[in-house]
């Protein structure tokens, strides 16, 4: 099955799977995926226990060439929305973290075998 035949939802799910594996390789533990509330959705919530950091990750998956301006995809409005969602999620947790971080992970699935990953840490 070629990458071009993937639906948007399948492409997004594939990208999130790649992102979760990438975070695990960095020593981060995924706490939640596709967490939703009435105000929106957080793609991945992960924890870096070594530094007491909780990381809210926005995943952007692209097929074909180029990342299409990954940094530009995360507008100040989007960062504000992620912050608001993060606050709602945090309010429901028993645990407390010393540091909060917002990351963006771009995943490009092309004709090559391995997806390419760009990880922008601390965008917000």
Swiss-Prot record:
Gene3D superfamilies associated with the record: 3.40.1350.10
Membrane-spanning residues: none
Disulfide-bond pairs as recorded: none
UniProt xrefs under InterPro entries: Restrct_endonuc-II-like, tRNA_endonuc-like_dom_sf, UPF0102_YraN-like
MF-aspect GO terms: nucleic acid binding
Superkingdom in the source lineage: Bacteria
HAMAP family per the UniProt record, alphabetical: UPF0102
PANTHER family with a match to the protein in the record: UPF0102 PROTEIN YRAN
Family in the record: Belongs to the UPF0102 family.
NCBIfam families: PRK12497.1-3, PRK12497.3-1, PRK12497.3-3, YraN family protein
Protein name: UPF0102 protein MSMEG_2508/MSMEI_2448
Organism of derivation: Mycolicibacterium smegmatis (strain ATCC 700084 / mc(2)155) (Mycobacterium smegmatis)
